[in-house]
Structure formats: C-alpha cells, structure tokens
C-alpha cells in the first residue's frame, strides 16, 4: 500500500487571496491546449485557423466548460436536489462539475464559433480534439491533489488511503488511472492519428470513442457517487454517459469513412 501524499489544496497565498491547485490545474490545462494549438497553426498543420481564432475559441470554451460542466452535474447527477435548492446551482465553490456536461458546452461553443468564422464544424473539432486530453490530464491531477473522486476499495500494492473517504480503506488511485488513460495515452494516440490527413470528422470520432472507452473502463475502479450508487446493469452514471459517446464516435467514424457516392 502506498501513502497518499497529503498536499495542501492551496497552492499559493497572496494576502487574503488563496489560489487552489484545482483552479491552477484548469489554467495549466488551457495553457497547454493553447501552446500546442499555436504550434500546430504556426507549423502549417492547418491553414483554416489563425492564432487569433485559437485564442477566441479557447476563451469561449472556458465558458462552455464551466457552464456546461455545472449544468451537466445538476441535470445528470443531482436534479432533485437542485430543483429543491435552485440557488445552489450557482455555488460553484462547493464543487460539482460533469465532464460530459462540459463536453456538450464545448460542442455548442464550437458550433457557434464555426458558424461565425464560416468554417466547417469538423474543421474546428478535428483541430481541437487532440489537444483536449491535456486539459483532462491536468484536471485529474487536480482531483488527486484534492484527494477527491477516489477509487473503490482494493488490495493492489499501489492502493492508497484517502483521508477524505473517512473509512481508512485502501483504494484505487482512480484519478491517476484517468490522468494516464484519458489524458496522456489518449493525447498520444490522437496526436499521432491527426498527424496525417484524415477525412473530416474522423479525428473527432476517435476522440469520442477513445475517451468514452477509457472512461467506461476506469469507472470499474472508481467509487460511485454516494448519492447515486450503481445504476441499471451495475453500471455507474459515468459509464452510462460514456456509452453514447462510444456509439456516436463509432457511427461518425463509419459515416465519414464511406467512399464518396458517384
């Protein structure tokens, strides 16, 4: 069993201002997306977008992630609670974000952005899809530092006791599994896959399938939300939300891989 490194969730204090690691990881994630996106633009990987376009897209994507992530959490995980306490929807400092909701928010942003810039939607989504896993990796590291979203009890040698779980049981460090699979591995796969010309939509399809599959697998080691538990077929909410991602990605890939009709 490994010792969980209890890290102060506050990364930096400047007078009364406290900068938390979790918020800092969000900033680092978007900074990584910007840096690699800029590199792809300046290296000629795409001629459809400019650096200014990238800056605008990231700015509005931040809004999409926050609004979509919060509303997704409200609707997917605790609708009854927030229906009874609607003002708590705005209590962002108490936590409660959904990746799947954030993804929907970003998709809406990309649709509006593509329309405004007169670009094809897949031109935008195929460009940004390989960069998203870096932001996910940073976010999962933030979860680990916070000691939240821990895994299920286990006896594997690398199990950790998370103090905030309150039961003293050794658990899977599932945040690190997600960091590795949904972050680093998915980034490497998409970066390689998108390095060669692909039909419009195929890089986006690979992201949907890759993230959905990795998230579905890791959820078997992640502790279900205590207010939901496991749902139908013994699957978690995260798994049920990931299944449509895999199916949509597979459908999109097959559709875009079809030879053009004559």
From Swiss-Prot:
InterPro entries: Lgt (IPR001640)
UniProt protein name: Phosphatidylglycerol--prolipoprotein diacylglyceryl transferase
GO biological process: lipoprotein biosynthetic process
Record's keyword annotation contains Manganese: no
EC number of this enzyme: 2.5.1.145
Binding site for a 1,2-diacyl-sn-glycero-3-phospho-(1'-sn-glycerol): 140
GO cellular component annotations of the record: plasma membrane
Pathway assignment: Protein modification; lipoprotein biosynthesis (diacylglyceryl transfer)
